[in-house]
A protein has these predicted regions:
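Bacterial N-terminal signal peptides
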Residues: 8-17
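Bacterial N-terminal signal peptides that target proteins for export
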Residues: 1-9
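Sequence-structural signature of mature extracellular/luminal beta-sheet repeat domains
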Residues: 21-326
């Protein structure tokens, strides 16, 4: 049996097991009132070698996630069974679902050195596109120049769509792409439950903007300062609390007013987070690295980028915002 086949079998067998193995940290979750109970346990939902980024919950209580290097969108159903949801995604690195049920992705094209050599050559640059039910490019340029490597995206109930690509941008209702500031070094991007506030990571700071339904953003301000680490993928709960992935530090939680509430530690460095599951009270998070078929930390040959990832889940007291997928 090949190593890939064995790896899939191990992932299925141990996908729901508590994860205490070589290459990960033992963590203790402390209470954050109204957010997570003391002693709550992370479990593995999925692990694999082909990446998992830009997580978004589905209406059925499952998960979609971008797998950039094989150019696919992966899917977990409500029981954490994995399948390939979409193929030929042009190197999608993040995915979301709008109010019309369309699958929208930040497509990174050929910008990652770990891209599979088995894929056909690509000539188009990064773009924000609808992938399903019909494919449509929404943005591929800013001020006449091709977009840089894309990171994350969010779309409001009203259709406002904003994304990060080095800095941060919004797509106005007329299709114009507007930048939010050349001095922003953004990765994660998120909207408040009422779609009126846009949150943007800027290294150790979270910025906030007022945003209108047409995608116009204004009133830039500092929302919060991270307690260690740099901001990455974000999500939001029904009470408007913001959850920020910060690598080895964990998932930092902030009130709607920007007050730091606490950190949920993760066994691995975290880069993406999303609510899903029954009643949207399960928090999913992507951790860097995974177990190989031998039960040890997966390694690649020297010089080959390691895209192995583990998706964890944890029961929450807080409920994710149900008004949007992300």
């Amino acid at each position: 049996m090949g190593s890939k086949a064995m790896f899939v079998i191990l992932s299925c067998l141990f996908g729901s097991a508590l994860f205490l193995a070589q290459g990960v940290k033992e963590v203790t979750v402390t209470e954050i009132p109204g957010v997570v109970a003391a002693g709550a346990k992370w479990k593995i939902a999925w692990q694999g070698t082909n990446n998992a980024d830009g997580l978004v919950g589905t209406a059925e209580g499952g998960l979609l996630f971008a797998q950039e290097q094989p150019s696919t969108i992966g899917k977990l159903d409500k029981d954490d069974h994995y399948s390939v949801f979409l193929k030929d995604t042009h190197g999608a690195g993040s995915v979301t679902i709008d109010s019309r049920g369309r699958i929208i992705a930040a497509q990174r094209s050929c910008t990652d050195p770990g891209r599979s050599a088995n894929l056909p050559p690509c000539t188009e640059g990064p773009m924000v596109s609808v992938l399903a039910p019909e494919r449509k490019v929404l943005a591929d340029k800013f001020q006449g120049k091709p977009l840089e490597r894309l990171n994350d995206l969010v779309v409001g109930k009203n259709g406002a769509l904003c994304f990060s690509a080095g800095t941060a941008y919004c797509i106005k209702s007329d299709g114009e792409v507007v930048g939010l500031g050349n001095d922003i070094r953004s990765n994660g991007i998120m909207l408040s439950p009422d779609d009126k506030t846009l949150y943007v990571t800027n290294n150790i700071v979270i910025l906030a903007f007022d945003v209108k339904p047409d995608g116009t953003a204004s009133n830039r301000r500092e929302f919060a300062k991270l307690q260690g680490g740099n901001g990455d993928g974000m999500t939001i709960d029904a009470a408007g609390r913001l959850y920020v992935s910060t690598g080895a530090v964990g998932i930092q939680v902030f009130s709607p007013e920007g007050k730091y509430l606490g950190t949920i530690p993760l066994p691995r460095d975290v880069a993406s987070v999303a609510f899903s599951g029954p009643d949207k009270k399960t928090l999913y998070a992507q951790g860097r690295g995974a177990l190989g078929p031998d039960g040890k930390e997966f390694r690649t040959p020297e010089g080959v980028r390691n895209n192995a990832k583990t998706i964890y889940k944890i029961p929450m007291l807080a409920q994710g915002f149900k008004g949007r997928a992300k």
